[in-house]
UniProtKB/Swiss-Prot annotation:
Belongs to the GatC family. It comes from Shouchella clausii (strain KSM-K16) (Alkalihalobacillus clausii). Its EC number is 6.3.5.-. It is an enzyme of class 6 (ligase). InterPro entries: Asp/Glu-ADT_sf_sub_c, GatC. This is Aspartyl/glutamyl-tRNA(Asn/Gln) amidotransferase subunit C. It catalyses: L-glutamyl-tRNA(Gln) + L-glutamine + ATP + H2O = L-glutaminyl-tRNA(Gln) + L-glutamate + ADP + phosphate + H(+); L-aspartyl-tRNA(Asn) + L-glutamine + ATP + H2O = L-asparaginyl-tRNA(Asn) + L-glutamate + ADP + phosphate + 2 H(+). Heterotrimer of A, B and C subunits. It comes from the Bacteria. GO terms for molecular function: asparaginyl-tRNA synthase (glutamine-hydrolyzing) activity; ATP binding; glutaminyl-tRNA synthase (glutamine-hydrolyzing) activity. Keywords: ATP-binding, Ligase, Nucleotide-binding, Protein biosynthesis.
Amino acid sequence: MSRISKEQVKHVAHLARLAITEEEAETFRNQLEDIITAAEQLNEVDTEGVVPTTHVLQMHNVLREDKPEKGLEVKEVLKNAPDHEDGQIRVPSVF
């Protein structure tokens, strides 16, 4: 017996505002059936003694520590800006 019907597939397609044919509904039903079967096989895997994890690799932040450092002076920044006014960098209008 099928765990998902063609009508359920058509209903979900309707909710997603997708127009699908009868043939597509049957194709998707078969594909979903295969996906459910594959997911159910995971329940059969023996996980006794396996520590539950939230990540595949037990890596922590491998980046350097954030340390505040003194940046450029405003004068230096404005010296490299193509256009500025009143201590602000002027950029082309976006809107």
